Amino acid sequence: MAARAVVFTGNKSMSNIFTAPIGQLRYILVTDNDYEKVAAAMDEIDMEPRYAEDVLKQWGDSVARTHIWENNEWINIVVRYDRQREGNALQKHAVIVHEAMHIVQEIFRHVGEEAPGDEVQAYFLQEVCYNLFVEFQEQTSGE
């Protein structure tokens, strides 16, 4: 499993920081649409405040969106999921799988792997999905 570092405890709309098993890549899930909370989460992984504004502007009507940027040390990924959107549990999980695949693709791009094996891809997707599913459940339990 990826390493977890708590960003904010006791706040369901903030995320743990997950690190990829290879490379210098980390990712979080944000399910809140409140600007201050999104900006605070992004600040935890060293995103410049002006970029947080760009992320929010790009949100539009998307159910979910994956944002990727680099700083001197990390490839950083924020997955935003609109927790107020309609849909059953299977539909919501399917969207999370879609976003997880973007993370897996970025992991392999980051380490220069152009043709990862099927089993390796499946393993990474399983791990990222698991992390995002657990995080999504923690952030949205009781809704």
Where are these predicted regions, by residue range?
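Charge-rich, low-complexity N-terminal segments
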Residues: 8-47
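Short helix/strand-bridging catalytic loops that position acidic/His residues to coordinate divalent metals
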Residues: 107-114
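Short alpha-helix boundary/capping segments
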Residues: 88, 92, 114-117
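Active-site recognition of the HExxH zinc-binding catalytic motif
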Residues: 94-106
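Post-HExxH zinc-binding segment in Zn-dependent metallohydrolases
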Residues: 115-143
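Ordered hydrophobic segments in well-structured contexts
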Residues: 6, 26-30, 65-69, 74-82, ...
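Active-site scaffold of zinc-dependent metalloenzymes
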Residues: 44-90, 103
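N-terminal amphipathic/basic-hydrophobic helices that include classical n-h-c signal peptides
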Residues: 1-13, 127-134
